[in-house]
């Protein structure tokens, strides 16, 4: 893969055409009230584009298009083979436009171009292609009945899905939802975060080029309290697929209950525990994976290993190795292919992370201070040790490159510390002891448990959380459960 060089990407950014309109019923269009908002480059703080500010009237327009095409059956009743062909074409186009999409992602979010080009865009295309290839292999069932009856169990598309996605992995998380939703035959109204809407807008144009019927995918940009709320309270939306904060997830559940009891599938916050036992097979490897698990994407990862639990006897040795590994994660210009850490999404979020660091200085020892990183919205690797497990630093999702270290002396204590959280998205265990690995994996209250790695995985396995980290699953065939209805058809053969 050719990552080019800083000047290449800067020149490309200058000539980049940025689409800024809504996408409704197969066409780019201004918001009904002709209002816009600015999306800002987190490096320079300069405006990138004026984006259409969609509101409830625009959601209604998108709803009309989405419902109309769904009821006509242009997509919902089409064959799996047709859907497969269109979605594979979309994946092809995403790969062909990988540099453009990666640049939009990096300009919008401040993440390193290396990661956008190597991880985000290929991962997004892979998600679309995976469900394209899977959908004609999903079968119904025939239940056992008497000889004069036939009972069939079939899966049908839910209807119109509202997909609400966050700003940390805009295109990747969009495609985790679009892949199964579209493959199953649904129509989708996509609302990207107002902080990172550019790649979603561009994706809509590529979907039309791939042959997706008009109205099947609509993109309405805007704010959560306007466009987002219009979706969550809309009486004609059949389901919401959401990734974001636990606080917003709770509001979506309330809105669904107050409207039409639409399904709400949530992937929310996390405060994942990374547990290193004294019999860890390779402390150097564990330190490297731990650093990547908290500092990748500037710590703006829902499943980041933000709590490091170290067995007392190896804690000091491990922390020395971890400090060395942190040197590989230093903020730089996001368009420089050598950069491993970019900026946080914006200065407001950086201020929030700074406030946690200031508070943490009175709660534990600051082993590594990532402040003064050189860019306004950037924060480097930050590590606190010996923090009270009850402190907010240990319990709240910071969503930045801030690691909290706690020591333990027994397996039971490690388990108690790990599970003592409102969240349950991920956890990791480093040990040579296979029996311990099994015990811990089964007793940890988390949707994903990693043994001797951190956050490995691919499209074949589900992703989601326990407790206030959400419900339902993204990725794998299990994601189709969110986007399909299960119908029983009972036929009397003697009639």
From Swiss-Prot:
SUPFAM superfamilies: ALDH-like. Pathway: Amine and polyamine degradation; putrescine degradation; 4-aminobutanoate from putrescine: step 3/4. NAD(+) binds at residues 244-249. Transmembrane segments: none annotated. One of its GO terms (molecular function) is aldehyde dehydrogenase [NAD(P)+] activity. Optimum temperature is 37 degrees Celsius. It appears to be stable between 20 and 50 degrees Celsius but becomes very unstable at or above 50 degrees Celsius. Keywords: NAD, NADP, Oxidoreductase. Catalyzes the oxidation of 3-hydroxypropionaldehyde (3-HPA) to 3-hydroxypropionic acid (3-HP). It acts preferentially with NAD but can also use NADP. 3-HPA appears to be the most suitable substrate for PuuC followed by isovaleraldehyde, propionaldehyde, butyraldehyde, and valeraldehyde. It might play a role in propionate and/or acetic acid metabolisms. Also involved in the breakdown of putrescine through the oxidation of gamma-Glu-gamma-aminobutyraldehyde to gamma-Glu-gamma-aminobutyrate (gamma-Glu-GABA). NCBIfam families: PRK09847.1. This is NADP/NAD-dependent aldehyde dehydrogenase PuuC. It comes from Escherichia coli (strain K12).
